[in-house]
């Protein structure tokens, strides 16, 4: 916590030296793993440090990710007192063998305890799910969705499992010990999630995110998808301000050493030109419910729009109104849509 607060102080100095006005934070998101493994007092101190440095806008959304095993009423109350308004609980699955495949150690029974603790502290609740783990069936996924809905969260995220190079799971797949994720099964799981959640009153607002209404959407994540500015703190954190993107060194020791010496923890940076910013707008904004303006598609790629409508990937009516908006089929093939529309 002390090192992260040192970076917060460093960022204030950077803005002052650049003659830039400090803006109140409209959203804060504490994630990147399992922050609730930290003592709640340290988490609270970090949030208070950010608030003191920048201020929080009225009605600011302040989210903390949480492992279900670490959330007690006392923890939730302490976080709420520090200004947290929302808790994103890493449920992942309700099925023990799926959790084992994902190498998650929490007890599914603790989801109810964590949700009750968060609600008791007045926090909004989001549940995070992952689908497509080795050995997970469509029936397993249905069980996880039903269990998640039984907790009546304000918001729900469902992400397809991505196999990261260098992980234990990647090595097991390479050796043939476990099967690779099945694309067709993952598509069936996504469609099941969308149908099940819609029937329970949840509306999709981003490819992998659903909420009970507009007020329950994650404003912080929407800021990412809309290409707005953010400042990320911590080892490996990425930031984006006024067309400049930079990222911190990943190793915690190197990160701490740089800040102790009064140096920037940034490992690299790049200025995004108009072409790159246009591509990124298409990549990110096409994922959200309102879509992206068709003006971001270059003139030589506009001809692809008709084909995407014919293939049922984007909404024809929205295209006439000047928007690229994904259909359900388009959400399943979002990357292909972006490839078709980028130079």
Label for each model-derived stretch:
Residues 309-321:
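A short, conserved structural fragment
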Residues 187, 298-299, 328-331:
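An alpha-helix initiation/capping motif
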Residues 282, 302-303, 335:
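Auxiliary N-terminal substrate/complex-recognition segments of SAM-dependent methyltransferases
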Residues 1-296:
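C-terminal scaffold of the Radical SAM
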Residues 298-312:
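Short amphipathic alpha-helical interaction segments
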Residues 321-327:
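Minor-groove-contacting beta-hairpin "wing" of winged helix-turn-helix DNA-binding domains
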Residues 328-343:
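Short, amphipathic alpha-helical interaction segments positioned at domain boundaries
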């Amino acid at each position: 916590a002390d090192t992260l607060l040192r970076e917060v102080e460093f960022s204030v100095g950077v803005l002052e030296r650049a003659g830039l006005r400090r803006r109140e934070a409209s959203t804060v998101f504490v994630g990147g793993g399992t922050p609730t493994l930290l003592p709640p007092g340290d988490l609270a101190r970090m949030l208070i440090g950010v608030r003191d440095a920048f201020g929080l806008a009225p009605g600011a959304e302040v989210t903390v990710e949480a492992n279900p095993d670490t959330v007690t009423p006392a923890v939730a109350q302490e976080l709420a007192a520090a200004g947290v308004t929302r808790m994103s609980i890493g449920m992942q699955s309700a099925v023990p063998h799926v959790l084992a495949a994902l190498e998650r150690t929490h007890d599914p029974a603790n989801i109810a305890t964590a949700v009750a603790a968060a609600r008791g502290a007045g926090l909004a609740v989001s549940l995070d799910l992952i689908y497509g783990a080795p050995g997970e069936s469509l029936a397993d996924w249905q069980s996880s969705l039903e269990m998640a809905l039984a907790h009546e969260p304000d918001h729900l995220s469902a992400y397809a499992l991505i196999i990261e190079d260098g992980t234990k799971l990647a090595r097991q797949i390479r050796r043939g010990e476990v099967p690779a994720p099945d694309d067709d099964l993952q598509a069936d799981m996504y469609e099941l999630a969308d149908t099940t959640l819609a029937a329970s009153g949840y509306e999709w607002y981003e490819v992998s995110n659903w909420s009970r209404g507009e007020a329950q959407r994650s404003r912080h994540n929407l800021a990412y998808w809309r290409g707005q500015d953010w400042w990320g703190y911590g080892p490996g954190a990425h930031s984006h301000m006024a067309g400049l993107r930079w990222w911190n060194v990943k190793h915690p020791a190197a990160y701490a050493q740089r800040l102790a010496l009064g140096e920037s923890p940034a490992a690299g940076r790049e200025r995004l030109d108009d072409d790159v910013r246009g591509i990124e707008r298409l990549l990110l904004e096409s994922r959200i419910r309102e879509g992206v303006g068709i003006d971001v598609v270059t003139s030589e790629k506009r001809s692809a729009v008709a084909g995407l409508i014919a293939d049922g990937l984007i909404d024809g009516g929205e295209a006439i109104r000047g928007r690229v908006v994904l259909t359900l089929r388009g959400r399943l093939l979002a990357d292909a849509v972006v490839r078709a529309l980028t130079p």
